[in-house]
Amino acid sequence: MAVILSVDPCYAGLVGLAEGFRTSNPPRIRECIQCLQAILQFNPPPATQAKTHLQIGRILQQYTKNDDLARRTLEKAVSAELGHGYEEISFEASSILSLVYKDQGQYPLAKQVLRQALEITSGENLYFWQFRLFFQLAEVHACDNEFTASVEVLEMGERIAEQCGSQYMRYNIRHSHNCIIIVLLIMKDVNRVSNILMSTGSFLERWQGQSYQRESLVVFHLLLRVWQLLSVGQAKTVRPYLKQLQQSIQNLTTMTFEGMQPGPNVYEAEKFEWLPREHLCVLVYLVTVMHSMYAGYMDKVLKYSAKALNQVERLKVTSPSALVSVFQLMLLEHTIMCRVVQGQPAHAIKEISQVYQTLKHENCLVRAHKPILHTLLGLYAMSMNLMEQATTHFNIAFKTADNPVLANFVGLNLSIIYIRAGESKQIELSSVMSSIHPSNMATNSHSLQAGYYYVCALRAFFQTRIQDAKKYLRESLKIANAEDLNRLTACSLVLLGHTFLASGNPQEALNMVLPATQLSGKIPDNYIQLWAAGLLRDLYGMLGQPVQASESFHKHHSITKQLIENHMQARKLPEHGLTEWTGAVSPTKSSTIPPQQSFQTWSQPGPSRLS
């Protein structure tokens, strides 16, 4: 007993000192871990040793990249033989250890440690940990593409929620269950997905739970609804649901996690939060950014991305995780596409470099995000008129993308490059066009269908099949107008103007290009404005309107000059060397660009890319 008493003050002092180092600005993680390791030198009781190993493992997992040391440390905490009353140490260690296994791609080990922990909880009323472990196990199965097993785990969790009388957890699990079903169906059966979400919505209407709990589930439900509609490119249809979601998250931020439903079991269950309020806020920002990108509101993309990224930076300090890094990557991806559209290549390549550096330090995210990185580099290279590099990156992304939406998006941009290349790329063009044909698409995306018809029109125009081009453009415009896909509408109108000009009808061509000019100015999209200004200059000249022709000439000249300056600025940056990176080796220095490859304006129609 004397030994224990002599250790306790040391233990408390070292833990307090470690926490001081952890919470310092910046955190002093090395010193924090050294303090915790010093506790073990006193040979404390097994429970104290296990808790200390848990604390060290948690710090290593959250703040360092030393996954192997975190794994070994947490395995000691999990394997410790502790008596009754210390179960939470084992559960938390198992929970964090499964995250380490998952990040390393060791899915069987992650499932094993979670199932072993769940076996211990099955005979106890430890509902908080049961639900946390159920959710984690379902997530691991989903990451391993075992969606049926993931659904079965969540169904088990729902039965536990019914047993303990927690309506909150029952609907929380049902939403997660539906989320996986939506992932499986969204590419094939949009109507069934809508029915599932309507059914869940009716459950929420009937359930009169605590205000905070109910509002958090409403946010979750609306997030799924908005995400589902955006996934199929319905920017107009999603608008009322997005407004509801934004109002709901505002309501949630003003609430506190107040009184629970009566009953000890229910109270224990409803302490659980799978997605904290701070994460929900970032997700709402993210879907708002996605909607703005689809609808062509580039200023809003930058505005909401900046707000969300600020919140992500705070989360990386207070609760760092791979999920927070995913939020950061997705926001950066949309910001980069916006920069490319607006003709800001220097900003774009710097932010692409941020994505590259994040993936370099987050190995668990490389598989999902590397094809996206190549896509972003392809869009950047395409906007810089580096078609060889753009083709290389798009082909890598096209072959490695697991997401059919991304693959189709890449295929559309790759097709534009091949169309511009002429006869030399007809075989490659036919192959890509066949794979992205609507009948072969694994998705019912309105935006991708409209994009496909636009690319078909561009191909027909280059082959001087003017009537076919008009036919495809009418299909593209019908879909784009119905869902407020403004960039695609502007592109289609300018190309339609070219078809009317080729048919000898300059006045009708003018009627198409003028609204496209206004629309591209609102976006704003410098490349479409440049394209439209060049066509307007020629049209006004043909129609005998010299003043308007002169205005269009000066606008074309001004945009061209600004883009040339922006491109030259981007080429001087060391990050520009990423255009030469193919994924085999890390880029260490910028590439040398021959002077003859400087920016050129295309005389032929078509935007530089379909981002």
From Swiss-Prot:
Protein name per the record: MAU2 chromatid cohesion factor homolog
UniProt entry keywords in alphabetical sequence: Cell cycle, Cell division, Chromosome partition, Mitosis, Nucleus, Repeat, TPR repeat
Example GO biological process: cell division
Region spans: Disordered: 581-611
TPR repeat intervals: 11-46, 91-124, 131-164, 371-404, 490-523
Record localization: Nucleus, Nucleoplasm
Compositionally skewed regions (Polar residues) per UniProt: 585-611
Role this protein plays: Required for association of the cohesin complex with chromatin during interphase. Plays a role in sister chromatid cohesion and normal progression through prometaphase.
